[in-house]
Every structure is written in C-alpha cells, then in structure tokens.
C-alpha cells in the first residue's frame, strides 16, 4: 500500500477524499520568506529532521502557513496580462518542493514517533496544514492566471512534462470547482476541510487502538511455544493478545480453539466501531455532495475520471466478470474447508454447525495449504530470519535494477530500530535517493505495511536534482533473546511488495514534484510493486532470501517446490474477498443511503459465501476508505492485470534476473513517475495493449 500525504506531490492516501489538491505553489520573485528553511536546495540532500518537539511542530506549522500564504498572495496579485511560464508555472513548481519537504517533517511523525505527545502534535499539524492546503487549492485568483497561461502559452515550446503539469493544473482547478460561482466554491471548501479532518481522525483512531484480549494457555491451543513465549503475561499467568498483525494472524491461522478465534475476529472487526461508524456516516454523504456540486453523479464517478478505469461501469463489469469466473473455484474451496471443519469437530469433540464462520476462514485455509501442499508455515518461517531476508531482498533489487545500496552509519532516524540506506546508480555512481526501514511494531505506530514518500525526487530551482527519500513502514514480529524475527512467507511477500513501492519512489526522475515517485493513477500505483511479488515465488530467488536461523542451512528443494506449488491455494476465496471489499467500496461511494455494515455483510454472503459476524462493522476498520483509496480499492485487482502481463510476457520469458529487462522496467515503468499516463508506460514496455491472459492464469483460470 502507498500511504500518501495531503501534499499533491506525495498524495498520501489519507486525505478527505481524492488527492484533490491543485497544490498551488509560489512564485520565484516571492520566495524569500522560505529561504531560511531551504538549505536542502543547495545540494538536494536529505535534510529531514525527526527530533522536533510538540512545541516546535506547532510553531513551524504556523510559520510555514504564514510564509506560504504570503507568496500565494503575491502570485495572485500578478497582472493577469503579464503572466508567463517563468513567473507562474515554473515558479509554482519550484516552491512546491520546499513546502512538501517542510510538511513531511511536521505530519509524518504521527505515524512513527514513539512519543505520544509528538504524535498528537503531528496529527494536529496535519489537520491544520490540510485545512490550509484546501484554502490554497481553492484560490481562484491563481487558477485564473494558470488558465490564462494555458490560453496564451506556446505549448509547442515547452517540454512535454511542463505541458502536462499545466494541463493537469487547469484540470485539477476545475475538479476543485474553481470555475463555479463563489458561493458554491465556499461550500465545497468548507466540506473539504471537514472531510480532511474526518479522514485523519478515522485512521488515527485505528493507529491508537490498543485493545487486547486475555487468554489462558489452554485457550491458545496448538499455537507454537515460541509465539506464546513472546507474549506479555498478566498477573494471573494469562497471556495478552493484541489486535496488531503479529498477534492477530498467528491466532487466526493456527489456534484450534474456535471460541478463541471467534473472540479475536469479533474484537478485530469491532475496532473503533462506534467512533469510526459515526465518521463514515458523515464522511460518505459529504463526498457525495461535493461530487454532485462538481457535476458528477457520484463520488466514485468523480475519482474514477482520473484513473485508468475511467468509469464505474468499467469497474463494475470487471468485478462482476471476475466474480462469475471465480464462482466455481470458490465453491470448491468452501466445500473442501467445510469437510475439514466437520472432520476436525468430530475428532476434537467440538459442535459442528454446518457452516464456515468468519473466524474459521484463516484457520482452515491454513490447514488446506498444509494438507494439499504439505507446507507448514511454522517450519518454513525458520528459514526466513529477517536479517537474511533483508540482505537477499536488497541484493535482488540491486542486481535487477542496476543499483547499489549502502547503509548510513549513525543516521538521524526517529527510532533506534530504524535504518537508513543510500541508493546509487551502479553504473554512474549518481546518488538517486535514500530509504528508511522501520520494521517492528511500537505503541502508536502505523499498524499496517506501507511505503511513505517523504521527499520528492525532482528538479530544484537551480536546475540540480533533489534526491528522493522514502520510508518502508511495516510491523514484523520483534526479535528476542536467542531468536531473530522470523517471517512467514506472506510477510516476505509483503516486504517485497512494499519495497517495490520504495524503488518506484527512488527511481522516478521527474522535473516536477507533482509527478515524482508513485504519483500515478491510483489504479496503476500498485502495478510495479505487485509485479515484483513474483520473485518470492521463484525457487532461485527464494534460495537467496532464506537460511535457517539456527545453523544457516539452506531451505530444502522439496520444501521449496511445495511452497511454489502452493501459490494457487485458496486463490478463489482470497480473490473473492478482494472483490467483496472492492464492491463495498464502490457501493458506499455510489449510494450514500446504504449502511456500511449491512452492505459488507450482503457481499460476504453473496460473493464470498461466508457470512460476516453479526455485531461487527468491518468497514469501520477499513483504513482504505479514509486513506485515499475511496472508490478505488478495485485498483488492487485491476492493476494485477497489468503487473502479471508485464511479468509473464517479459521477465518470465527473458529470465527474471535478466539485467536488460530489469533496466527496461526501471527506465520505462519506474523512471517516468507520473509524467506519463500509466497505460502509455505499459504500452511502451509491452509494445502492445495489455490483456488479461496472464492475470487469469495466475488465478487458476483459463483465458478465453
């Protein structure tokens, strides 16, 4: 997942809705107020600071707002007849960089700081800056000057990327309603501010949730000793189980006590139920109302206009068609699971209720994997200690993309467990960027897996290039005395996926911050990282990623073959669940009268064939709804069509570690960032229109 901040150039996926900001920036002539904060423009280095106190965050937020507003005001007062490319468009692009970097230092700590007061100050800064962003994005005076420039500028004399910047600026201005009457603009502005606050609060609630359940050892039946030994104990010798991934999924996959799994699933899908349900009940109608004012039928229509899918009709057809194709496979998988459950209930004396419950799904899918393919993830993870996986992952990416990584000693980081690496082009030695690895859970930390773009890789006012900086934030189990952090294979896949986003951030080399890194269409943004997941299903790559944590012995060929063969296990149910989430997202953003919990329950029954647990409200825990994937969750499946096409037609055909294909991928897919349309990049890479054949094959289906 790409987490995108409100800055349009980073587009962190948590804003009130849609990456809607025009992100008007300032003029060359009026840059002086920011010069004192702009030492990073000297050589484009990483100057991000992570030691700001709550007071400093608050003060610097107000300073940034005041200084930025002054420059906007100066730009807005330019005589409209004297607007030029240099004093308007280029000036806007130049100062955009400064604002983004300053903002990062203020709003990113809410996700990673160990200090609760710093997180709170950062969240408030994000809210304050988000309101300001909306104010600036609604500056009609600046919009009129950009429109004037487009009308008078000789577009043939400016670079294609600059022309794209100009055209998108006009387009985004209209999507902000700046062509509408002032009263309507003010109404939209007020609603956007409220939407932004609601989205920030929605995800803050999830991040700060510290719910835990207490179980006896008997209630944790069949869970491995190493997991139980890692748990915090209560005074009465019971065990605390949090709802964070490193606790939740092991329990749901391996605990043989149905009541324990039921309690965990119930708690997990009622996180923040009350407060986030209220937020959704306000947020969804606001989005719909803004879309209507802007001339769109629904919020989904509004956001899809800028994506490769283009319309709700195309998305609905794609999801319904895939659902129908997967229906027989899903039915067969459910039947197999139900038989497993019946047999186990008879053997262990549990009551058999004749159905698959939500808390049964992970458990019996894990059993299916073990029975059909003899893959025991508990044994397998002993070959994936995090240090070995990290070294192998970094080596594979370096070799594939023609890069070199070097760990920075004594790096300035936000937590002592975080590491920083510098990325260089292997052939030229040019520094392309840096990335942070933040791998372990902490209190208050962002609780999923994501890549954060922190500093855009783009041109500075003097023509030099600013290095790109990104952070990979995940939550793998903590190492402990005598035992390193051991990763399940699905965690290795997640690691590879998110690092693919990091490489997109680092390898993109654009002129404008707005197009840097992963600033592509939302239903294209997952393509590069999804494509790279294929490496963790390749035997040669897996050998490079694995070594037994005790004696360094290699993973056996037999175990490798079984793991690779298991790729299609449960693929019907797993894909149908993605369709459920995509359909819920589409429904909530096309019909605001729907109840989120009821809509989720409906699709769980109709499509997945596994009922949602009564009393839960999964959408209230669904961070994507308030994190920038609103109306766009389908993009995960949609983009797999493209990623699988690229992999099978090029990498699989030419060799997955073929450096020529790797450089072709780096140059044609990663390097352009968002300076080209996603479909154009795909056609440049494939030399043809993309098709679904490889995607359907990856799902165990035959292409027509």
From Swiss-Prot:
Q: Which reaction does it catalyse?
A: Preferential cleavage in neurotensin: 10-Pro-|-Tyr-11
Q: Which organism is it from?
A: Sus scrofa (Pig)
Domain of life, per UniProt, equals Eukaryota
The protein, known as: Neurolysin, mitochondrial
Q: Which UniProt keywords apply?
A: Acetylation, Cytoplasm, Hydrolase, Metal-binding, Metalloprotease, Mitochondrion, Protease, Transit peptide, Zinc
Q: Which cofactor does it need?
A: Zn(2+)
- Report the cofactor remark: Binds 1 zinc ion per subunit.
Q: What does this protein do?
A: Hydrolyzes oligopeptides such as neurotensin, bradykinin and dynorphin A. Acts as a regulator of cannabinoid signaling pathway by mediating degradation of hemopressin, an antagonist peptide of the cannabinoid receptor CNR1.
Tissue expression summary: Predominantly expressed in the liver, kidney and adrenal gland.
